[in-house]
């Protein structure tokens, strides 16, 4: 019988509801801090306020407060926005904080209990540079043992075992480092055995999605149980995107709400707008790919939460879906992308 493994236990796929497939509710993004431009240093070193928010929106990774997405203020703001997401029809959130991002399972479990939103926690490894020394030299076999334990046995949180429901996000740079190659191979091996979903994070070059999906597939992982994240900042050319789509994985646009004139994590490209994301998704729907499309926000900094002037986890439901309907996307197609596809990806047989 198909099931989905949440942090509070297994549920049947029909109970999942509208789902955000790539989010964070608490994590440490300080590794990506970038020194602020000299002209704006004083503003970006202050606490986030109406007086400094404009600078933070332009240089989000140059505010130390902004990338500390784990302190008490961040947790309170995150909780508020999860409740807003629930209020506006949200059913589930897939929490992608893996090893290297300091996931907070205790907080995730508490959110699931107190908000009524289903939470699915991930296992797996983020990029090599974010790992603790105890993880940096793990072999493929040790990684497969760890991921299997997280999914089958779980981790103790306040006296109860909390199980991961998928592997992700599994992240890499380009070219892929040896540690990251190990984590991709381990993800593929465990997926083949357990039938779980997997979420991959490519580096910010167009060759990266092809390379890491190939490694995962060669290890035995199934394409139809794998999500390629962050395509809206990685594959800009539609022909190249359609070529990648032939590999058979889920195609995820997960930076909805991120609209900026300067993308700090890759200044060589221009970040697309929500309108362009919608246009691309419609093109993919017209290519017959609606059964492989997913959407999310990848919230990982404070300034994207409503308490800090951001859009929150309900942005897609309240602002994007209405625009899609205006452009001719049908209710059935929206349900496919936001309900059916997430459930199919996350489901595995007992």
From Swiss-Prot:
Its EC number is 3.1.-.-. GO terms for molecular function: hydrolase activity, acting on ester bonds; zinc ion binding. A divalent metal cation 2 binds at residues 169, 201, 230. Keywords: Hydrolase, Metal-binding. A divalent metal cation 1 binds at residues 22, 24, 169, 298. The keyword Disulfide bond does not apply. Binds 2 divalent metal cations per subunit. This is Phosphotriesterase-related protein.
